[in-house]
Amino acid sequence: MDFYPVAIEKLIEEFAKLPGIGRKTAQRLTLHVLNLPADEVREFAKALVKARGTIKYCSICGNFTDSDPCAICSNPNRDKSIICVIEEPKDIMSMERIKEYNGVYHVLHGNISPMAGRGPEDIKLRELIRRINGDVNEVIVATNPNVEGEATAMYISKILKHLGVKVTRIAHGIPVGGNLEYADEVTLLKALEGRTEI
């Protein structure tokens, strides 16, 4: 194990808590930050603190926002009769990259995963059900194409069928076991166009 002063070791530990960041990458990030000019470090720290203090969840869809409702939910040009259900806020960014979807979103903030101890009550399904009214014609389920995403999609289909709304699933142009975050625009567009009713 490397020997660093306590302050450096603490920064390495904090960077290593980020998803996809191991100890080696955390060390590189730490050393990079320490070599930045002091004013850049201050700006970086201010940006982190400001984002953490001002960003919240949209009360309608659950997306990250600095105003409530978010820009998508408050946009009068969005088709509110179509709701695309996704697992995490980052998936909205992926879907928006294709520039073809004009509906609104619903963020579950997770998926159903019995192995991880997450059931339907642990994700934002009650909020989704509350959004289904006479104005919603279709719910597109765009959960990730893995075991948990499929289980979540089937559960959503089952509960929404009773409400008389059309439920579709994006096509599997996205590799099984993959994440929306890593899909390119063409793959996402094909998956959206090839969605099927579930």
Curated annotation (Swiss-Prot):
Superkingdom of source: Bacteria
One Pfam family cited in the UniProt record for this chain: RecR_C
Toprim domain segment(s): 81-175
Family designation: Belongs to the RecR family.
InterPro entries assigned: DNA_Rcmb_RecR, Rcmb_RecR, Rcmb_RecR_Znf, TOPRIM_dom, TOPRIM_RecR
Gene this protein is translated from: recR
PANTHER family associated with the record: RECOMBINATION PROTEIN RECR
GO BP terms: DNA recombination; DNA repair
C4-type zinc finger locations on the chain: 58-73
One MF term in the entry's GO annotations: zinc ion binding
The protein's role, per its UniProt record: May play a role in DNA repair. It seems to be involved in an RecBC-independent recombinational process of DNA repair. It may act with RecF and RecO.
UniProt key word DNA damage: yes
Record has Plastid as a keyword: no
Keywords: DNA damage, DNA recombination, DNA repair, Metal-binding, Zinc, Zinc-finger
The protein's name in its UniProt record: Recombination protein RecR
Originating organism: Clostridium kluyveri (strain ATCC 8527 / DSM 555 / NBRC 12016 / NCIMB 10680 / K1)
